[in-house]
Curated annotation (Swiss-Prot):
This is Protease HtpX. Its cofactor is Zn(2+). The active site is at 144. Keywords: Cell inner membrane, Cell membrane, Hydrolase, Membrane, Metal-binding, Metalloprotease, Protease, Transmembrane, Transmembrane helix, Zinc. GO terms for biological process: proteolysis. The keyword Hydrolase applies.
């Protein structure tokens, strides 16, 4: 979930910034976006722009946010094992060798990110490396490699771009309706009305952006099942089931809720509707039913 939450947070921030830029351009250069055709076009440009920028920044943001130390040259036995395992799995799936990194965390987590399946980043926590068996860790790595091979981040970007477009479009339309309803020609200047329109549209974008994230989360859950299946094909489903069962036994004692939502595991107080990963028991059941 770490890569998804980081992507969504970056996307929301970028989208809000781009929306502010759009409003400034509209005010200073007289660019009208209130017509349905022009508004939809601008919503698409800024909506997809936000998700694409988030994708391009994903590796940099992940490294910076979690202090990922990229393995340039393995220096220990465990680093050699990690590097060689990722290299072997990358060759098996036909992708370019990803950057391999480790970040310091007691939580048993891993994530993959990057704008290109041939230039991705696969990072694992120190907690995973030192608390899982080699077979379990190998299955986790195969899960992340499957995400890269399946192009999940690019597909997520396209879906997020569509969602952003409709969020911006609907927010601006509703903001126009509300601001016109609230406006009094006798009491309010056009400048004040423009400020009200801008403020209302920002509120709507924030609210609808959070609600629309359920669509992205649903997509993410489906891709998790697929990545689990990909891992099972690479290393065997018994290893992947063992890794998930290890997470089920260990994740209750990990970090607080804000951190436990990350990685391939994650306990969260939110309902499944807002979860990027299916419950562990459902993932295990799906693997057991694989033929």
């Amino acid at each position: 979930m770490k890569r998804v939450l980081l992507f969504l947070a970056t996307n929301l921030a970028v989208m809000l910034v781009l929306s502010i830029v759009l409003s400034v351009l509209s005010s200073f250069f007289g660019i009208s976006t209130r017509g349905s055709g022009g508004l939809l076009l601008m919503a698409a440009v800024f909506g997809f722009g936000g998700s694409i920028i988030s994708l391009l920044m994903s590796k940099w943001m992940a490294k910076r946010s979690y202090g990922v130390q990229v393995i340039e040259q393995p220096r220990s036995e465990i680093e050699y094992w990690l590097f060689n395992t990722v290299q072997r799995q990358a060759q098996q799936t036909g992708i370019g060798m990803p950057e391999v990194g480790i970040y310091d965390s007691p939580d048993m987590n891993a994530f993959a990110t990057g704008a290109n399946r041939n230039k991705a980043l696969v990072a694992v926590s120190s907690g995973l490396l030192y608390n899982m068996s080699r077979d379990e860790a190998e299955a986790v790595l195969a899960h992340e490699i499957s995400h890269v091979a399946n192009g999940d981040m690019v597909t997520l970007t396209l879906i997020q771009g569509v969602v952003n477009t409709f969020v911006i479009y609907i927010s601006r339309v509703l903001a126009g309706i509300v601001s016109n309803f609230m406006r009094s020609d006798d009491e309010e200047s056009s400048a004040t009305g423009g400020i009200a329109y801008f403020a209302i549209s920002m509120v709507f974008e924030l609210i609808f952006g959070i609600l629309a994230s359920t669509i992205v989360m649903w997509f993410s859950r489906q891709r998790e099942f697929r990545a689990d299946a990909g891992s099972a094909k690479l290393v065997g489903k018994d290893k992947m089931i063992a890794a998930l069962e290890r997470l089920a036994r260990g994740h209750d004692s990990q970090l607080d809720g804000s951190m436990m939502a990350f990685g391939i595991n994650g306990k969260t107080a939110m309902t499944e509707l807002f979860m990027s990963h299916p419950p562990l028991e459902k993932r295990i059941q799906a693997l057991r039913e694989m033929r």
